């Protein structure tokens, strides 16, 4: 439980390296907010992680990471709900 009482945001957390990172952080006791390109993808990943870690706190959001105001709003909401953001994993890629 090395990450107990820590809050992490993981961009691109619904699959691949981001999902694996979320899984590891939850195993270590962190609260995890993962981002995905769609709310459906975020919800699916959250459901899978909650099934594996039923007592963990994990949430999914889908801000537009190519829009600074969308990112700011998402991070403000996360900080308001979960407190200080201790860890940020910038894993998502953005293409136009």
Identify the residue ranges that each predicted region occupies.
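A glycine-rich helix->loop->beta "capping" turn
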Residues: 52-57, 76-90, 96
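Aromatic pocket-lining residues of Rossmann-like dinucleotide-binding sites
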Residues: 25
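Conserved glycine-rich cofactor-binding loop
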Residues: 7, 14-16, 38
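Rossmann-fold cofactor-recognition segment
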Residues: 51-67
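NAD(P)H-binding Rossmann-fold N-terminus in SDR/SDR-like oxidoreductases
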Residues: 16, 20, 95
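The beta1-alpha1 cofactor-binding region of Rossmann-like NAD(H)/NADP(H)-dependent oxidoreductases
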Residues: 39-40, 62-76
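Conserved glycine-rich Rossmann-like NAD(P)H-binding loop of the short-chain dehydrogenase/reductase
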Residues: 28-45
